[in-house]
Amino acid sequence: MLAFAGVVHIPWSVPKPLQCIVAVARNGVIGREGKLPWHIPEDLAWFMDQTAGGVMIEGPACYAELGKALPGRGTVVVSRDPAKSFPGAERAASLAEAIVIADRMDQWPGPVWITGGERIYAEGTPLCERLLITRIDRDFEGDRFFPADWQKLFTKLVSSKAGEHEGLGYRFEVWER
């Protein structure tokens, strides 16, 4: 299982709240071959509602999964490849640079969201004040995982009633430091 990455140093304090949003299978899977291994419309609606008006920080695979920069929010893609472009999004070479860019996006006053994938979660989750997690009530095969030790960093504030889509159970939870 994936553990948290080393310390990410931000050059100055960041006034916008830094939060994380993720959907995770019971066995920690968050992706398979660049895609979500499930389709839950209510989870997508939750994601869209929560991140609206803020800035999303994501890796190239997450950008590709969404197909574009989503409207109604800013997007910063962390990619070490300076030749890659991401229409509608800013590019940063590191998570620290992405956080600084996101914080300066004044047209998006909402929180800065860590939205994946695996490496971005490993580096970014320890920096977050709040974690919004969709707990998927099933194991999935996958090749991308959420850090296994995340519960050491947060305390659960609230959990929704269990939902179900096509036999797949899920629950929305909010965790905070």
Language model regions located:
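Enzymes that bind and transform nitrogen-containing heteroaromatic metabolites
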Residues: 9-177
